[in-house]
From Swiss-Prot:
Record-given protein name: Thyroid hormone receptor alpha
Species for this entry: Aquarana catesbeiana
PANTHER family, sorted: NUCLEAR HORMONE RECEPTOR, THYROID HORMONE RECEPTOR ALPHA
Residues reported in the UniProt entry to bind Zn(2+) 2: 99, 105, 115, 118
Alphabetized InterPro entries for the sequence: NHR-like_dom_sf (IPR035500), Nucl_hrmn_rcpt_lig-bd (IPR000536), Nuclear_hormone_rcpt_NR1 (IPR050234), Nuclear_hrmn_rcpt (IPR001723), ThyrH_rcpt (IPR001728), Znf_hrmn_rcpt (IPR001628), Znf_NHR/GATA (IPR013088)
Record region (Disordered): 1-41
Subcellular localization: Nucleus
UniProt DNA-binding residue ranges: 61-135
Stimuli inducing this protein: By thyroid hormone.
PROSITE patterns on file: NR_LBD (PS51843), NUCLEAR_REC_DBD_1 (PS00031), NUCLEAR_REC_DBD_2 (PS51030)
GO terms for MF: nuclear receptor activity; RNA polymerase II cis-regulatory region sequence-specific DNA binding; thyroid hormone binding; zinc ion binding
Lineage: Eukaryota, Metazoa, Chordata, Craniata, Vertebrata
Described purpose of this protein according to its UniProt entry: Nuclear hormone receptor that can act as a repressor or activator of transcription. High affinity receptor for thyroid hormones, including triiodothyronine and thyroxine.
Amino acid sequence: MDQNLSGLDCLSEPDEKRWPDGKRKRKNSQCMGKSGMSGDSSVSLLSAGYIPSYLTKDEPCVVCSDKATGYHYRCITCEGCKGFFRRTIQKNLHPSYSCKYDGCCIIDKITRNQCQLCRFKKCIAVGMAMDLVLDDSKRVAKRKLIEENRERRRKEEMIKTLQQRPEPSSEEWELIRIVTEAHRSTNAQGSHWKQRRKFLPEDIGQNPMASMPDSDKVDLEAFSEFTKIITPAITRVVDFAKKLPMFSELPCEDQIILLKGCCMEIMSLRAAVRYDPDSETLTLSGEMAVKREQLKNGGLGVVSDAIFDLGRSLSAFNLDDTEVALLQAVLLMSSDRTGLICTDKIEKCQETYLLAFEHYINHRKHNIPHFWPKLLMKVTDLRMIGACHASRFLHMKVECPTELFPPLFLEVFEDQEV
C-alpha cells in the first residue's frame, strides 16, 4: 500500500517546496487536514460558499488564476484544474495530448480548455504531484483505511469518556453495600435458585377453558398454588425495605404507602431476573418455576406476558445482585405514590439511590451501548406492571373465592388505585 495512505483523512501530503514563479509556501499545517476537500464532497461545500481557513479571500489557482478552492495534489488550485489533473493521471491521457502552437500556450481561466497539453505541463510546472493521484484500488484502500481510523478514534473517544465517568464515592459504596446486603438477605434461595426450584406440574394452570382467547377465567388450582408463596414473598419485600436506612426514617404512613405501591413491582423484578430461557420459566419466590400460560391462567392474565417479556429482555443485561438491589431501592422510593406526606424527602432519597446506582454502573463498565438509560427504562416497565396488576387484582377478587386470598395479600393490594 502507498505509504502516503497511513493514518490520513486527507487526500494529499504537505509539501515544503516554494511555488514556482515566486509563489509562497503553504501557510500552515492545516493544509493537510483541509486537503480532504479533494473528494466529491467539496462540490457541495463550495456551493455553500465554503472557503478553507488557509486560503485568503479570492486566492487564485496557481494553474489558471481562477478562484482557488483548496490545497490539491500539493498545490492551491481551482476545482477545474484539480479534476483535470486527476483525470489525466488516472486515465493516463497525457501521452495523447498535443499542442498546435509548439507548447507555448498561455493558460488562464479563459484558455485553459483550449490546450490540454499546455495545461497539463503547467500543472506539473507549478508542482502538482502525479504520485498523489490514486488509482481505483488505492483509492478504495485509502477510503477503507480512513473509515477504519475514524472507527478507531470513535472507540478511543468512547473509552476515554467511560474512563472519565465518576465512580461511587466512599459514602456511596457504603450505601451500595447496605442495599446489596438487604437484597441478599431477603432474596429466597439466593444464587442457588436453579438447583432448588421445583417446577409447577404441567397439568396445573393449563385449563383449556382458561386458555381460550375469549375467556378470562382464573384457573383456581393454579391460583391456589400461587397464593401459597405470596405471603412469604411479600414479607421478604417488607424486610428488604426495613433494612434501608433512609426508609426507616420516614413516617409510618409513608412507609405503608411506599410498600403497597412497590410490592408487586419488586416481586416481578425478582421473578424476571430468574427467567430461564432453556425451560422458558420464571421462578417465583425462589422456589416455584412456572410457565407463561400457567402464570397467566392462574390469575395474572396479561400481566404474566409483561413479566415474562421483562425477564427475557433483562437476561441480556446480566445484572448482578447490587444492580437488582438498587433497582428495588429506586422502585421503593417513588415520590409520586398517592397520599404521601414527605414527598420531597422521598424524592431526595430516590435521587441519592439513583446517583449511587449510576456511579456503580460506570464502575461495572458494561459492554451494552447506553446501558444506563436502557436500564432505567426497565423501571418504567415495572411501574406499568404494578399498575396493570392493580387492575387485574379486582378481576381476581370477582373470579376467586375470598377464602383463597391470604390476609397479607388482601392487605397490600386491596386498596390500590387503578
